[in-house]
Swiss-Prot record:
This is Putative phosphoenolpyruvate synthase regulatory protein. It catalyses: [pyruvate, water dikinase] + ADP = [pyruvate, water dikinase]-phosphate + AMP + H(+); [pyruvate, water dikinase]-phosphate + phosphate + H(+) = [pyruvate, water dikinase] + diphosphate. Pfam families: Kinase-PPPase. Its EC number is 2.7.11.33, 2.7.4.28.
Length: 271
């Protein structure tokens, strides 16, 4: 029987779930995850306790609860459940209040922007920009890009671009490097004016072949020798052009995005 883990929040639960994944990944154990977002009333808090207690009875062991409930009364209700309750706000906010000699707002949902805030609008603009400039489909307004990711097809450019846009409000375009570029020995002409914005992604040729075979099995496009050729040529071009790059083979999208932000000095987010 897998241990049951509840993610309880008065908002979307994204913060609590991210934290929970980071903690639980330290254990060689699978868990059954139950998300309980928008617990923004006492009635919902009591209903959540019922769910937690039912899981404890079913599992024959108490549940584990990660909570980011801001309302102290709701939090106290959840803490009376048959569970190990890990209260992230109490653990971190109270010591910060003492250190800063300030009281926190204790307002629900402050960690996520509302639709009418400038931060939210910036993020939506960045997402629209990244979608419009995915895989080199448009050169229009490329000068507005914060970063332009380059690399061979299926090296991780699209998911990284969208993650940068959604998570950080970064206008990230991406552009493929194709065999014709390698034959010319030059970057695509559309990228020439923006060399300072370029960041490259590479990948292990064998892994690239596996990914491409899922899309076009048995094709030259997916053949190991072709993948080796494209990767070797792409990396040589990036070195020649002075483009910073990394291998996406063993890195998560989060790690790739964080490295890019550091390398191109886009670590500008404030709170």
């Amino acid at each position: 029987m897998l241990p049951t883990v509840f993610i309880v929040s008065d908002g979307t639960g994204i913060t609590a779930e991210t934290f929970a994944h980071s903690i639980l990944s330290q254990f060689d154990q699978k868990f059954r995850l139950v998300r309980v977002p928008f617990v923004d009333s006492l009635d919902k808090a009591y209903a959540t306790v019922e769910k937690i207690n039912e899981a404890a009875v079913h599992d024959g062991r108490r549940a584990i609860v990660f909570t980011t409930l801001v309302d102290s009364e709701s939090n106290d209700i959840v803490k009376r459940s048959n569970a190990l309750v890990l209260d992230m706000f109490q653990r971190f906010v109270e010591p910060l209040e003492q250190e800063l000699e300030l009281k926190s707002s204790h307002a629900m949902g402050r960690g996520h922007q509302n639709a009418d805030t400038e931060e939210y609008k910036t993020r939506i603009e960045a997402i629209n920009f990244s979608l419009a400039h995915d895989d080199g489909q448009s050169n229009r307004n490329l000068s507005e890009a914060d970063v332009i990711l380059v690399g061979v097809s299926r090296s991780g450019k699209t998911p990284t671009s969208l993650y940068l846009a959604m998570q950080y409000g970064v206008k990230a375009a991406n552009y493929p490097l194709i065999p014709e570029d390698f034959e010319r020995g030059k970057l695509p002409s559309a990228l020439s004016p923006y060399s300072e914005k370029l960041f490259g992604l590479s990948i292990d040729p064998q892994r690239l072949s596996e990914i491409r075979n899922e899309r076009r099995p048995g094709s030259k496009y997916a053949a190991p020798e072709n993948c080796r050729y494209e990767i070797n040529e792409a990396e040589a071009m990036m070195r020649r052009e002075g483009i910073k790059w990394l291998s996406s083979t063993h890195k998560s999208i989060e790690e790739i995005a964080t490295t890019i932000l550091q390398e191109i000095r886009l670590d500008r987010q404030s709170y």
